[in-house]
Amino acid sequence: MKRDIQYLLNPALQNIATYRVEGGQQAEIKLNQNESPFDVPMWLKEEITGEFIKEPWNRYPDILPYRGMQVYADFLGISPDSVMMSNGSNEMLYTIFLACLGPGRKVLIPDPSFSLYEKIALLLQSQIVTVPMLPDLDFDLEAILRTAHDEAVDFIVISTPNNPTGKSLTFEEVRLIAQSSDAIVLVDEAYIEFSRQRSVLELIDELPNLVVLRTMSKAIALAGIRIGFALANPLLMAEIAKPKIPFASSRLAEITLSMVLANYSLVTDAVSYILHEREKLYTAMLTIDGVEPFVSDTNFLIIRVSDAGSVFQNLQSQGILVRNVSGYRLMENCLRFNVGLVDENQQLIAKLRQF
């Protein structure tokens, strides 16, 4: 081949880096991916696999995971026509972005936010309009409203509670954004179970331009099974479904979802623990010299230190893996870590006191 292979690829790839997790995904104390510290109990895993082995493995699952969508619709008390299940919420992000964006279309993204938003928008050769957070990492609501209007954006994506900042918009603030804009508004509620704010799910019938994204990877503790959902009014959902990859969700995912939701007290107990430990961690961080914690509305905390790179490496060398988020706007020398088990949290506190 005489031509450079790069000229045969999507030119947008030149502006995109491969997604990676600094420090890897293995550690004695792993606190870098905002996962639940609690695995699904073995008795429930055995019940799930007992059901799964009855399924035909040589046959494709349904084109769309109708069983899983019905189960989640019943759990939420909404119409199944308002529900779309995916192989993790990241796959659903790709689906929604494909349905809403394309070359030249404008997407508004508060900055910093989940990095995958910008990556998908760049792949689709869309124009990204960023709105910086305030210095305390809170959303700048007025700037979002003003920019959405002045730039006539086509799509707005808001992570609330937000990753990586841990801050949230209120129910009424999200409603105002969606009411005030002619754009599709995607609200990523990956961390909603940990939030002091209430979900905007009840607004999907009132606001025809609103889409709510959910994941089963955080509070529900199913990161390894890959389950996500989009929730919207049926007319909008029918359009979003058009680029959805067929057969993407496995029967195992549907069975797991059904049986975990049937034992939801496991989730509520875990969330109660995480919220309690989150406050204990925050209080402890306030007592450590050189550590500035930020109030969190998620299952993770953000702290600012004098040298995040050095602290990150020192923790990693001692078997504790956190996330260095210093590369994000306004987050210089910041580290992020999710709530772990009691002993893990205590070890993290002890190590930070040594620096």
From Swiss-Prot:
Translocase found in the keyword field = no
Swiss-Prot/TrEMBL keywords: Amino-acid biosynthesis, Aminotransferase, Histidine biosynthesis, Pyridoxal phosphate, Transferase
Does the keyword Isomerase feature in the UniProt annotation?
no
User: SUPFAM superfamilies of this UniProt entry?
Assistant: PLP-dependent transferases
Gene Ontology annotations of biological process type? L-histidine biosynthetic process
Question: What terms describe the molecular function in GO for this protein?
Answer: histidinol-phosphate transaminase activity; pyridoxal phosphate binding
Q: What is its EC number?
A: 2.6.1.9
Listed Pfam families? Aminotran_1_2
Identify the pathway: Amino-acid biosynthesis; L-histidine biosynthesis; L-histidine from 5-phospho-alpha-D-ribose 1-diphosphate: step 7/9
Instruction: Give the reactions, separated by semicolons, that this protein catalyses.
Output: L-histidinol phosphate + 2-oxoglutarate = 3-(imidazol-4-yl)-2-oxopropyl phosphate + L-glutamate
Which positions bear N6-(pyridoxal phosphate)lysine?
A: K218
Its protein name is Histidinol-phosphate aminotransferase
